[in-house]
């Protein structure tokens, strides 16, 4: 199960991919 787009975007920003 993938996290919501809103949260996923923030996580990607923090992780930096």
Swiss-Prot record:
One of its GO terms (biological process) is toxin biosynthetic process. Optimum pH is 7.0. Activity decreases sharply with increasing acidity or alkalinity. Ubiquitous (at protein level). Highest levels of expression in digestive gland and crystalline style. Optimum temperature is 20 degrees Celsius and activity decreases sharply above 40 degrees Celsius. One of its GO terms (molecular function) is hydrolase activity, acting on ester bonds. Keywords: Glycoprotein, Hydrolase. Its EC number is 3.-.-.-. Glycosylated. Strongly inhibited by the serine proteinase inhibitors BSF and AEBSF. Not inhibited by EDTA or by the proteinase inhibitor aprotinin. Hydrolysis of carbamoyl and sulfocarbamoyl esters of paralytic shellfish toxins. Homodimer. This is Carbamoylase-1. It comes from Mactra chinensis.
């Amino acid at each position: 199960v993938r996290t919501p787009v809103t949260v996923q975007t923030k996580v990607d920003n923090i992780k930096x991919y």
